[in-house]
Curated annotation (Swiss-Prot):
Record localization: Cytoplasm
The organism of origin for this protein: Elusimicrobium minutum (strain Pei191)
Quaternary assembly: Homodimer.
EC number of the protein: 6.1.1.23
Protein name: Aspartate--tRNA(Asp/Asn) ligase
Taxon lineage: Bacteria, Pseudomonadati, Elusimicrobiota, Elusimicrobia, Elusimicrobiales
UniProt function note: Aspartyl-tRNA synthetase with relaxed tRNA specificity since it is able to aspartylate not only its cognate tRNA(Asp) but also tRNA(Asn). Reaction proceeds in two steps: L-aspartate is first activated by ATP to form Asp-AMP and then transferred to the acceptor end of tRNA(Asp/Asn).
């Protein structure tokens, strides 16, 4: 080994010992002929002192930031007045005996310590500099700990780690596939997997019983802060299980991951809510439940109302829901109400009713349309007090829920609400199985075409498919969808029935999903599992807004890699071998 220790690990326990350290020059300064170098590696920094009597003093004097050095030196305590309490190695320094320059560095476009202030494309172009930033190194280390903790947990609980293929067949469901042309099979293509879904279900039919994988998945979709064309997920599947068993496996893994990342393990079991209840209470299927501001159904107050906004909504089978903004009048003025109304319209509403409670009465443009009895009932139902505000949405449930969800999220910011805890997990379960696509006159999977319906709802597949609830679930953490999964269909006849509702003919179903369908009719056990976003989990634990901050070499928002300048044009001979012509 070239070194005896890492820079950040040297402390007063090493005083009077000779250590060999390697790293980058983080900074240098000359104080009265004595050279001070801060030597950095991934663990931290240590101060190196090169005295003028040192035989390598002249060589060390040529070192500049980001030069790579090997230093042999004696560890000593700093004088009391020179101790740096902000550095874990701040009590000691290393007096150099030998200095060797292992490599020089050109003038860099930015200093690693300042990389987080640089525009993202430049950071990604020079990622080898950006990753030297201590925050980035911490993020990658945390990601590693998350992956290792997940592996340990599943390995210790009877799961087998199995790799599934990266080159597979295209099944045009969900996002677009990344296609890979075959040289050997002219005119045919592989697809990169959007998930290991069919393979892991086939493994359950194969008797594997418990599978896990740190899996790569690929989706050709428009990007956001929490999306990449390629991502990593902690993927599991289990045989002979109920929803409760799958939840317990996820909760156990999360506990180990949090401990590995230096966080307190969250209390289990996590809170569970039905999809319909979550949408009614929070207006979102991935709510941040740390904030105590809820949506309330107030339709019962207005059953005989003359205010057409609410009466028409109720007459057409819609809902009327409200959010109380505690002391909202202290934070929200008329201009802000107009912006909230614009937000409601952008989210699908025709408008937004708002009221302010002051001097024991409601005020606002719409107050005059309500009767005294309705306003009194509203005040009682929502426990409205002085300076509170009320925001009301009225329309079809599928319109009101997301609108009020958007208003809730904005009110959390406007009211400067504080979360009531650091971490809040929520299992959202029993999503609708299907949703209707009117322009195509067919049903489509609300989440996953392989999700099982609730047993009691199976008869509804023949009469009212839109009312069928499923064993689909999401795990939400602080308003972020962390995992998605379900109990699967393990019978071919039921799976084909659902695919038929989605207008997959038997021939199409056999062509696209034949591998899985054949496995299901060969004695597949009941099974279920989930895929959890490793990138998202690491980003949350690192308190990062974007998953790009926890991925070593991510793409930009346009799926471009500035470091490798890909995607790129390839040579004609390569295209010819693949039987491809570019027009």
């Amino acid at each position: 080994m070239m070194r005896t220790n890492y820079c950040g690990d040297i402390n007063k326990n090493y005083v009077n010992s000779v250590q060999v350290l390697c790293g980058w020059v983080n900074s240098y300064r000359d104080h009265g002929g004595v050279l001070f170098l801060d030597l950095r590696d991934r663990t931290g920094k240590v101060q190196v002192v090169v005295e003028p009597t040192n035989k390598d003093f002249e060589l060390a004097s040529t070192a500049r930031t980001e030069y790579v050095l090997k230093v042999t030196g004696l560890v000593r305590l700093r004088q009391t007045e020179h101790i740096n309490p902000n550095n874990p190695t701040g009590e000691i320094e290393v007096v150099a005996q030998e200095v060797e320059i292992l490599n020089t560095s050109i003038q860099l476009p930015f200093e690693p310590d300042n990389s987080r202030q640089i525009n993202e494309e430049t950071r990604l172009k020079y990622r080898y500099i950006d990753l030297r930033n201590p925050v980035m190194l911490h993020n990658l280390t945390t990601r590693h700990k998350v992956a290792q903790a997940a592996r340990r947990y599943f390995s210790d609980n009877g799961f087998i780690e199995i790799e599934t293929p990266i080159l597979t067949r295209s099944t045009p469901e969900g996002a677009r596939d990344y296609l890979v042309p075959s040289r050997v099979h002219e005119g045919k293509f592989y697809a990169l997997p959007q998930s290991p879904q069919m393979f892991k279900q086939t493994l359950m039919a194969s008797g594997v019983d418990r599978y896990f994988q740190i899996a790569r998945a690929f989706r050709d979709e428009d990007l956001r802060s929490d999306r990449q064309p390629e991502h990593t997920q902690i993927d599991i599947e289990m045989s002979f299980v109920t929803l409760a068993d799958v939840f317990a496996a996820g909760e156990g893994m999360i506990a180990e991951v949090f401990k590995a990342a230096g966080e307190d393990a969250p209390a289990a079991p996590f809170e569970q809510m039905e999809y319909a209840d979550v949408m009614a209470k929070y207006g979102s299927d991935k709510p941040d439940i740390r904030y105590e501001i809820d949506i309330t159904d107030i339709g019962g107050i207005f059953t005989n109302s003359n205010f057409k906004v609410v009466s028409d909504a109720l007459a057409n089978g819609g809902v009327v829901r409200a959010i109380k903004a505690k002391y909202g009048a202290k934070h929200i003025n008329r201009s802000t109400c107009d912006k909230l109304t614009d937000l409601a319209k952008a989210s699908g509403a025709k408008g937004l009713v708002w009221l302010k409670y002051s001097d024991d009465k409601f005020e606002g443009p719409s107050a005059k349309f309500f009767t005294e009895e309705e306003l009194a009932s509203l005040q009682h139902t929502l426990s409205v007090e002085k300076d509170d505000m009320v925001f009301i949405g009225a329309d079809k449930e599928k319109v009101v829920s997301p609108v009020m969800g958007a208003i809730r999220k904005e009110l959390i910011k406007l009211l400067c609400l504080k979360p009531n805890k650091k971490w809040a997990f929520l299992w959202v379960k029993h999503f609708p199985l299907l949703e209707f696509v009117p322009e195509e006159n067919r049903w489509d999977a609300a989440h996953n075409p392989f999700t099982a319906p609730l047993e009691k709802d199976i008869p509804l597949l023949d009469t009212d498919p839109g009312k069928v609830k499923s064993y689909q679930f999401d795990l939400v953490l602080n308003g972020v969808e962390l995992a998605s999964g379900s109990i699967r269909n393990h019978r071919r006849d039921l799976q084909e029935k659902i695919l038929n509702l989605m207008k997959h003919s038997p021939e199409q179903a056999a062509l696209r999903f034949g591998m899985l369908l054949n496995a299901l009719e060969a004695g597949a056990p009941p099974h279920g599992g989930f895929g959890m976003g490793l990138d998202r989990l690491a980003a949350l634990l690192c308190k990062e807004e974007s998953i790009r901050e926890v991925i070593a070499f991510p793409k930009t928002a346009t799926a471009y890699c500035p470091l490798t300048e890909s995607p790129n044009v390839v040579e004609d001979i390569q295209l010819k071998e693949l039987h491809i012509k570019i027009k």
